[in-house]
């Protein structure tokens, strides 16, 4: 059994920060669960281009506000407590912070190793062993 407190991730390499978000990666590939589990906060007033070509992601919004806009069709969805969205088709999108920090719980398949950040195309690359 694995038991962790997200507070124990703060200040470790499993807490990854960019200009638009901070992600506390609680379960990772090394845990051998088949998915990774993260608590992420999207900063207010930010806009992040994301396109998970190599991963599927499900997101549960816990607190705060923001929006997500699909690039293919320009549809915009408001995000707030209780909203769940799933990027089941590797949907390219903009994730936008609102007036308050948006705290979300994310599940990724395949699992992240822990240090991933979006590249110039909004993608998390697969580890070298998985791309060979």
Swiss-Prot record:
Keywords carried by this UniProt record: Lyase
Top EC group: lyase
Catalytic activity: (2S)-4-acetamido-2-aminobutanoate = L-ectoine + H2O
One function term, GO molecular function aspect: ectoine synthase activity
Lyase is among the record's keywords: yes
Gene Ontology BP annotations: ectoine biosynthetic process
EC number, UniProt record: 4.2.1.108
InterPro entries reported for this sequence: Ectoine_synth, RmlC-like_jellyroll, RmlC_Cupin_sf
Pfam families per the UniProt record, alphabetical: Ectoine_synth
Pathway linked to the protein: Amine and polyamine biosynthesis; ectoine biosynthesis; L-ectoine from L-aspartate 4-semialdehyde: step 3/3
PANTHER family from the UniProt entry: L-ECTOINE SYNTHASE (PTHR39289:SF1), PTHR39289
Record-linked HAMAP family: Ectoine_synth
Function: Catalyzes the circularization of gamma-N-acetyl-alpha,gamma-diaminobutyric acid (ADABA) to ectoine (1,4,5,6-tetrahydro-2-methyl-4-pyrimidine carboxylic acid), which is an excellent osmoprotectant.
Family: Belongs to the ectoine synthase family.
Protein name: L-ectoine synthase
Lineage: Bacteria, Pseudomonadati, Pseudomonadota, Betaproteobacteria, Burkholderiales
